[in-house]
C-alpha cells in the first residue's frame, strides 16, 4: 500500500527468493511444506483481509527442483491463494516449466531471474540467454522473462553482504560523471521487450535445433519472430506465414527479431 501511494503497483510477490539457498544475505532455507503453511495461514489471508489483489507466486528458484512448486500447488489451502510458480535456471533444464504446467495447467508460470556474470562474454552469453530464456521460457509456458539486474556500477555494486559480487547490470552507471554503458542483458531483453508488448500471446512456430525461434501475436495484430542461429556456421532459413514465404540468412550465433 505504501508503494501504491507512491505510484508503484506491486503486481506480484514470492514468499522468499531462492528458498533452497541459505547463503544469500538476507536469506534462510524454507521447505515446500513451510512455504505452503506460510501462504495458507499467514500471507494469503493477510492479503485477502487487506483487500489486496497482488499475486502470490510460489517457489522462485531453480529448474532442478520442479517438485517443490508441485508440492506447494498440491496443498489445497495454499493453492487457493497461489497464482503460479516462478523459476530460475542456475540448475536444471528449462523444460521443468512445462513439467509444472502439465501437472497444474490452471496455474501460471513465470521466469523471474537470471544474471549475466561480469565481465561478460557477449556472444556466448547472448546466445545462451536467448536460447534458454527469451525463446526457451515462453516455449515452456512462461508468461514473462526477467533478467537480473537492471543496473550496477563498474564494480558490480551495490549488493548486500553475501550477495552476488559479479552480477553485471543491463546498464553500467559510472560512479562519477554521466557515462552509461549498455551490457549484454540489455540486448538480450531488447530483442523481445521492444517488440513483444504487454498483451502479446505466443503463437506456434516450427521448432528447430539450428534456428531456435519463438513467435508472438501482439495486441495490434503484428507478428513477431525471434530467431537465434544456434549453429557454428551461417544458416539459411525460410519463414512461411499463410501463403507467403521469405528466405533469410543468419550468421553463426546471431539473433534477430522480425516483425510483420
Residue ranges and their predicted role:
Residues 13, 85, 137, 145, ...:
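Conserved, mostly hydrophobic/aromatic
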Residues 96-100, 132-135, 211-215, 226, ...:
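Generic recognition of flexible, low-complexity loop/linker segments
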Residues 108-188, 204-207:
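Aromatic/acidic polysaccharide-binding cleft in carbohydrate-active enzymes
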Amino acid at each position: 500500500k505504501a508503494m501504491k501511494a507512491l505510484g508503484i503497483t506491486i503486481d506480484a510477490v514470492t514468499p522468499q527468493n531462492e528458498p533452497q539457498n541459505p547463503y544469500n544475505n538476507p536469506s534462510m532455507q524454507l521447505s515446500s511444506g513451510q512455504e505452503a503453511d506460510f501462504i495458507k495461514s499467514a500471507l494469503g489471508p493477510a492479503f485477502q483481509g487487506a483487500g489486496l489483489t497482488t499475486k502470490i507466486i510460489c517457489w522462485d528458484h531453480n529448474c532442478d527442483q520442479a517438485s517443490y512448486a508441485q508440492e506447494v500447488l498440491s496443498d489445497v489451502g495454499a493453492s487457493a491463494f497461489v497464482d503460479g510458480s516462478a523459476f530460475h535456471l542456475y540448475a536444471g533444464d528449462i523444460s521443468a516449466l512445462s513439467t509444472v504446467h502439465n501437472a497444474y495447467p490452471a496455474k501460471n508460470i513465470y521466469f523471474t531471474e537470471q544474471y549475466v556474470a561480469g565481465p561478460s562474454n557477449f556472444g556466448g552469453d547472448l546466445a545462451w540467454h536467448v536460447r534458454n530464456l527469451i525463446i526457451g521460457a515462453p516455449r515452456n509456458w512462461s508468461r514473462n522473462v526477467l533478467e537480473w539486474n537492471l543496473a550496477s556500477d563498474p564494480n558490480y555494486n551495490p549488493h548486500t553482504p553475501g550477495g552476488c559480487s559479479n552480477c553485471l547490470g543491463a546498464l553500467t552507471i559510472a560512479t562519477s560523471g554521466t557515462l552509461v554503458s549498455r551490457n549484454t542483458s540489455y540486448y538480450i531483453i531488447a530483442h523481445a521487450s521492444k517488440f513483444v508488448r504487454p498483451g502479446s500471446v505466443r503463437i506456434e512456430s516450427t521448432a528447430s535445433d539450428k534456428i531456435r525461434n519463438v513467435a508472438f501475436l501482439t495486441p495490434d495484430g503484428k507478428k513477431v519472430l525471434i530467431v537465434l542461429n544456434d549453429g557454428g556456421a551461417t544458416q539459411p532459413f525460410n519463414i512461411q506465414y499463410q501463403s507467403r514465404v521469405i528466405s533469410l540468412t543468419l550468421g553463426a550465433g546471431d539473433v534477430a527479431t522480425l516483425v510483420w
